[in-house]
């Protein structure tokens, strides 16, 4: 019987599960949209809603509680400064889970969990790192070199 089962164990120990959700919460706050398996997304949804509700209180004790849960100063700052302002008139339902097909390797059901009214530019936070790497072709090789006629010398 499945009476009184409060949460999904996800085949992990309690410490592993706690670290997994801490990292997923930080990623969701940073990028505002992540792709994961459906059970993880369903388990993450109430956690992110509680974290955002705690961030909306914006007092010292809520900041300390957020930092103990997330352990990331940048995530706590974004929660309090950006997300709490965005959702100040919303009374819950800050995230949504959208089914996204099945994974190729193991046929696991995938889902996209995203924040409602998310900032689309938030996914492009780390794009600078990819752009700064030198390209394989240089601009000199792309341009055609002008051919100059070669004069043969007579003997």
Which residue stretches match the model-derived regions?
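Structured, basic alpha/beta domains of bacterial-type, RNA-associated proteins
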Residues: 1-150, 154
């Amino acid at each position: 019987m499945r009476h009184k089962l409060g949460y999904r164990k996800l085949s992990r120990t309690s410490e592993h599960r706690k670290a997994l959700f801490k990292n997923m919460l930080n990623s969701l706050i940073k990028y505002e949209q992540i792709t994961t398996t459906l059970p993880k997304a369903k388990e993450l949804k109430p956690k992110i809603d509680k974290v955002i509700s705690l961030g909306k209180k914006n007092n010292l004790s809520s900041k300390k509680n957020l930092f103990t849960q997330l352990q990331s100063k940048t995530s706590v700052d974004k929660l309090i400064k950006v997300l709490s302002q965005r959702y100040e008139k919303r009374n819950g339902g800050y995230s949504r889970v959208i089914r996204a097909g099945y994974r190729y390797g193991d046929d696991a059901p995938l889902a996209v969990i995203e924040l409602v009214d998310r900032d689309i530019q938030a996914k492009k936070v780390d794009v600078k790192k990819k752009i700064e790497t030198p390209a394989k072709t240089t601009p000199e090789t792309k341009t055609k070199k002008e051919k100059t006629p070669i004069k043969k010398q007579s003997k």
